[in-house]
Regions:
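Amphipathic alpha-helical, heptad-repeat/coiled-coil segments used for oligomerization
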Residues: 1-23, 136, 140, 144
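C-terminal or internal capping secondary-structure element at the end of a domain, subdomain, or sheet
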Residues: 121-144
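Conserved pre-catalytic core of RNA-dependent polymerases
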Residues: 113-118
Length: 144
């Protein structure tokens, strides 16, 4: 004697899709929460001159730049190109048009040591960022 079980899993699949969509929507605000922490720390870590200054590159002299120019050029932006349904990416950097010398400060030159402010901020805030992302993700999924 056999037994036959018939099950319609359409409703179950629909619920799973809804849950996956909900989880996907939570990634962007969670990622932004972490990006904000790094962004604020980068602004604090960014070196600032005491007076207006020129910046000497290999092929050009840039400036004059006012104190805080590099700090004020730091931004964060959501990256549509590097984000997907369940992955949200933010870029934190400096505006190279406003502060073309940013890379020379962040990475150094053959004559000047690096004064990292972006990479240093990522390292310094790593555990705080992870906790903030996790908390915001849970908050978003649970409906605040």
């Amino acid at each position: 004697m056999g037994m036959k079980i018939k099950m319609d899993v359409a409703k179950f699949k629909e619920q799973l899709r809804a849950t996956a969509d909900e989880l996907g929507r939570a990634t962007r605000p969670a990622a932004q929460e972490g990006a904000q922490i790094i962004y604020l720390q980068a602004r604090l870590n960014c070196p600032e001159s005491d007076a207006a200054h020129m910046f000497h590159g290999t092929n050009a002299v840039y400036g004059p730049y006012s104190p805080g120019n590099l700090r004020n050029s730091i931004y964060q932006v959501f990256s549509k190109d590097n984000s997907f349904k369940d992955v949200s990416t933010y870029h934190i950097s400096w505006n190279a048009d406003k502060a073309p010398y940013g890379a020379m400060v962040e990475f150094g030159t053959s004559r000047a040591a690096a004064q990292s402010f972006i990479a240093r901020s990522i390292k310094e805030t790593r555990s705080e960022v992870r906790a903030a992302i996790k908390a915001r993700f849970i908050e978003e999924v649970n409906g605040k």
